[in-house]
Amino acid sequence: MAKKSKIAKNEQRKEVVAHHAARRAELKRTAVAVTAGEEERAAARLALQRLPRDASPTRVRNRDAADGRPRGTLRKFGLSRIRVREMAHAGELPGVTKSSW
């Protein structure tokens, strides 16, 4: 079980990313645009650097929805590999069966 503070911090980061997503995308588009002038591109890069650090989607961590485990998370289920295995064995994941051959 992850610390509650780590889970809460990650949720806060998700909100910050969502809040700044449109502005960030616009600035990135301007910063790499060939048609924009060099000064305009430099200003866009500077404005991009001024955004909060947590506005970058890279800072959001995929965590287990059940207990917040940060590693080994399967995106398809939103759960950690350990939790997926436990739930699959218990028959709690529809359509998932233990393979045997």
From Swiss-Prot:
UniProt entry keywords in alphabetical sequence: Ribonucleoprotein, Ribosomal protein, RNA-binding, rRNA-binding
Keyword Secreted carried by entry: no
Region of interest (Disordered), ranges: 1-21, 49-73
PANTHER family (UniProt xref): 30S RIBOSOMAL PROTEIN S14, SMALL RIBOSOMAL SUBUNIT PROTEIN US14A
Quaternary data: Part of the 30S ribosomal subunit. Contacts proteins S3 and S10.
Compositionally biased spans, kind Basic and acidic residues: 8-21, 61-70
Keyword rRNA-binding found: yes
Gene name as annotated: rpsN
Protein name, entry field: Small ribosomal subunit protein uS14A
Superkingdom as given in the UniProt entry: Bacteria
The organism of origin for this protein: Kineococcus radiotolerans (strain ATCC BAA-149 / DSM 14245 / SRS30216)
InterPro entries: Ribosomal_uS14, Ribosomal_uS14_bac/plastid
Reported function: Binds 16S rRNA, required for the assembly of 30S particles and may also be responsible for determining the conformation of the 16S rRNA at the A site.
Pfam families hit by this protein: Ribosomal_S14
GO terms classed as biological process: translation
Family, per entry: Belongs to the universal ribosomal protein uS14 family.
Alphabetized GO MF terms: rRNA binding; structural constituent of ribosome
GO cellular component, one term: small ribosomal subunit
